[in-house]
Amino acid sequence: MTGKDIQIGQNISAGFFFRCGHYGDDVDYAIITGVVIRKLECYNQVLVDVDLEQSFNSPGKSVWVRLDKADFNINN
């Protein structure tokens, strides 16, 4: 699936690795659930407004997710 297959307003779940730490040299894993609020089809990315109560270890309230690097499901 690519960014063209996902619509703004859809609810998705995604698991992905992200960089963290003082210099960005550490890696952690997050599982998020939320609504797609923007998308960049040319970079195969979507911006997700994260539901923090339904998510685990989210790096922020809004997260850009690279669809080719994440395990994701469309919940709608």
What does each model-identified segment do?
Residues 42-48:
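Short aromatic-glycine-enriched beta-strand elements
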Residues 1-23:
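Mixed-charge, Lys/Arg-rich low-complexity intrinsically disordered regions
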Residues 3, 14-15, 30, 34, ...:
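Small side chains
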Residues 19-26, 55-59:
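Short, cysteine-centered beta-strand-loop-beta hairpins and adjacent loop/turn segments enriched
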Residues 52-76:
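Intrinsically disordered, low-complexity, charged/polar segments
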Residues 23-39:
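Short beta-strand-centered aromatic/proline hotspots
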Residues 32-35, 48-54:
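A short beta-strand signature
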Residues 5-7, 39-42:
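A short, structured loop/turn motif at beta-sheet edges
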